[in-house]
């Protein structure tokens, strides 16, 4: 039995509602929240109840399928207008995660030629389910490829949570840990706590422990010391957006780790599906970086820890330059070398 079966799914479709694993409640309680409107889906994404680029795309797809069932119009033209409004609305929830827009575009395209409302509603539900099913297979493939980069007994550092609960299943950066466990390859994770929302401390440690995988939690500012003293052999992270030249947006603090990897001469890998690539943007300078509420920094679990009125800069992501990345691990294999050329070649083959 796969080790990830022990980990609750991030998103489940109920036909007339969506059940999302409320990740703001972890690790203290495992609670599912029922979403029945497009507004609830939007809020759930913004409030990080569902998070992780692939999972955001999945819940957005289900949200659009759900919303379409509630349109009262009898005309396909009005149906399409309402649907496009909902697509645009969901797109405002988290601007950096490209899987969100990828899923929205895919849902839009699925009904472009449809002439009846009933058929459109049926196709939207089927497409959302297909997106979820495909993501599970894609993440397993990423894990298989990533595992070739490591050997039994390796200590591997990661940040944030790019695991099973951030995807349909398996995750991206955490996928090789699960595949490794299935195949008898023991990998030990060192998880950065990931301030300010503690996705590493709350989520990565929780899901790896669910699967019986060795994990050690460290504070973010311990990373250099851990690499130096704990025989860290590599760093692997997820991604929220990868552009045409390989520059990668991921959780704030990722670039710090890439710089440390360069200094300590250890590999720095990015693991992400092709749906996370945005080849319409040429460099990372074009990526819009989400900035979040100051209270994420000034308060910890609701308690004020900084003087009231303190100025806060709270970007959710940073951009790691391609020259700091050893390889980008996708479901199609590992991209190395001239990223601009190799990414263009890969997308030409898959188009």
From Swiss-Prot:
GO molecular function: S-methyl-5-thioribose-1-phosphate isomerase activity
Record pathway: Amino-acid biosynthesis; L-methionine biosynthesis via salvage pathway; L-methionine from S-methyl-5-thio-alpha-D-ribose 1-phosphate: step 1/6
Pfam families named in the record: IF-2B
Protein name in the entry: Methylthioribose-1-phosphate isomerase
Record-annotated site: Transition state stabilizer: 160
Residues of the active site: 240 (proton donor)
Catalysed reactions listed for this entry: 5-(methylsulfanyl)-alpha-D-ribose 1-phosphate = 5-(methylsulfanyl)-D-ribulose 1-phosphate
GO biological process, any: L-methionine salvage from methylthioadenosine
Record keyword Transmembrane helix present: no
EC number: 5.3.1.23
Family the entry assigns: Belongs to the EIF-2B alpha/beta/delta subunits family. MtnA subfamily.
Entry binding sites for substrate: 51-53, 94, 199, 250-251
Top enzyme category: isomerase
Assembly with partners or alone: Homodimer.
Keywords: Amino-acid biosynthesis, Isomerase, Methionine biosynthesis
